[in-house]
Amino acid sequence: MSFPKVLNFKISNRRIGLKYKPLIIVELGINHNGKFSIAKQIIDKAKMAGAEIIKHQTHLPDFEMSEEAKKIIPAHTKDNIFKIISDCSLSESDEIKLKQYIQKKK
């Protein structure tokens, strides 16, 4: 089986393709529970484990969720999804500090 050349590309200076080592991308998600110190720990551990990219989303619950989200309660919790995302969101200043922290880790 032959693969098209499009499978070989670069992200910054990192080559991606079948003949290169796998690229490890870590999803930070909301695993930090809205705590900057935990986000930093996850980043540090990810870097130690070989991660080259951290994927992170900024959540703005008041802007990205409707009132309906306050009625949705996932099976594994007693809180609604709006509260969960609100509790697990970083502040704007922490988002900026987190970006700077990640950039220093390069």
Model-derived regions: residue spans:
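N-terminal amphipathic alpha-helix/helix-capping segment at the start of soluble metabolic enzymes
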Residues: 1-26
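Active-site-adjacent beta->alpha loops and helix N-cap segments on the catalytic face
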Residues: 7, 36, 63-69, 92-95
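Structural/interface elements that position substrates and couple domains in central-metabolism enzymes
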Residues: 22-25, 76-81, 103
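Conserved, mostly hydrophobic/aromatic
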Residues: 27, 46
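Active-site glycine- and acidic-residue-rich loops that bind
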Residues: 31-37
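A structural motif corresponding to the C-terminal end of an alpha-helix
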Residues: 49, 93-106
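Glycine-rich, proline-tolerant flexible connector loops at the mouths of alpha/beta enzymes
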Residues: 52-89
